[in-house]
């Protein structure tokens, strides 16, 4: 439906009948706004760009990628929509989904780090440090609105304000707060917020929600698309501030059908034995970790077996799933 031409411009083709117009137009607008951020960051530094895509967060095993859960919730709500019979019930679902998309941490981290990398700065696992509260030593996490303000500042410094417009356009602080505090009312064709007093037309909110769904879809697809640009393990330069060793290079770790899943040192076993320091920055599945333990030089992994098995299990009822799961786990 949405394709990028040779000039890098995204356009819509053969839009399915029944597609919401606001959603379809937002897809085009948001791809054209956000794609250049990915392209500029990749051009600046493959090393820092890959760290940004895989969202390096230090030492973690499987099961700590919150954005995977966000995508699962998105897909679950999409399936639920077809089972809900009444418009008000669908609206409640969409309002919650709107709030969840606005609160998801990774898209904020992603945009912040893309802007950092473009500026020549480095990837940071802590783009949004906690804010200290008074003299008692306590602190709190940044609110989503505060994260947005920081992203706007970074974009302004580089003349890229237009590229973050997708997030700015969909962000309604009062509506978000009302949803998560259960402080809104559906009445006739309106959504009402008692405090602060606001009245939205339901049609306007649905237009906003469709744009928000498009924003989420674009972010997910761009991450997948740019990961897939790394089809085979390749040797790349590190950031100048990463290592003092002039010979330091890294290898891009890839998974068939996914693309980049991390980076690792490019030292041979002999070089490591003579004092070179090995390292890995990656997100691996449990069975891939075992593969890497057996072969520390491994950088080219087969397709995701877990996804493959999950697609099969999805078609079975829970009792059958529980019996099949141990069988599949032994096959990994």
Where do the model's predicted regions map?
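Amphipathic alpha-helices that form helix-helix packing interfaces
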Residues: 66, 73, 100-103, 107, ...
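Charged/polar positions within long, soluble alpha-helices
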Residues: 116, 177-188, 217-224
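Eukaryote-specific, cytoplasm-facing alpha-helical/coiled-coil scaffolding segments in long proteins
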Residues: 126-142, 234-252
């Amino acid at each position: 439906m949405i394709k990028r031409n040779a000039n890098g411009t995204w356009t819509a083709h053969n839009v399915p009948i029944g597609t919401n117009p606001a959603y379809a137009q937002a897809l085009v607008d948001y791809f054209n706004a956000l794609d250049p951020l990915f392209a500029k960051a990749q051009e600046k530094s493959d090393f820092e760009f890959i760290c940004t895509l895989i969202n390096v967060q230090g030492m973690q095993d499987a099961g700590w990628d919150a954005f995977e859960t966000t995508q699962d919730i998105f897909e679950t709500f999409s399936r639920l929509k077809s089972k809900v019979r009444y418009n008000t019930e669908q609206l409640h679902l969409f309002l919650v989904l709107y709030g969840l998309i606005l609160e998801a941490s990774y898209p904020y981290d992603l945009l912040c780090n893309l802007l950092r990398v473009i500026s020549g700065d480095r990837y940071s696992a802590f783009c949004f440090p906690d804010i200290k509260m008074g003299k008692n030593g306590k602190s709190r996490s940044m609110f989503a609105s505060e994260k947005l303000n920081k992203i706007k500042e970074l974009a302004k410094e580089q003349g890229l304000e237009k590229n973050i417009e997708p997030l700015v356009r969909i962000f309604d602080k009062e509506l978000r707060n009302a949803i998560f505090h259960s402080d809104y009312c559906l009445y006739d064709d309106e959504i009402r917020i008692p405090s602060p007093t606001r009245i939205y037309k339901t049609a306007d909110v649905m237009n906003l929600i469709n744009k928000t769904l498009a924003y989420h879809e674009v972010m997910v697809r761009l991450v997948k698309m740019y990961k897939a640009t790394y089809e085979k393990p390749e040797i790349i330069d590190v950031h100048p501030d990463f290592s003092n060793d002039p010979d330091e290079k890294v290898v891009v770790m890839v998974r068939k059908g996914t693309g980049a899943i991390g980076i690792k040192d490019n030292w041979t076993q002999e070089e490591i034995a003579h004092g070179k320091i090995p390292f890995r920055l990656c997100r691996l599945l449990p069975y891939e970790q075992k593969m890497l333990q057996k072969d520390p030089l491994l950088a080219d992994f087969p397709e995701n077996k877990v996804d493959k098995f999950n697609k099969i299990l999805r078609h079975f009822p829970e009792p059958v799933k529980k019996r099949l799961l141990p069988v599949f786990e032994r096959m990994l």
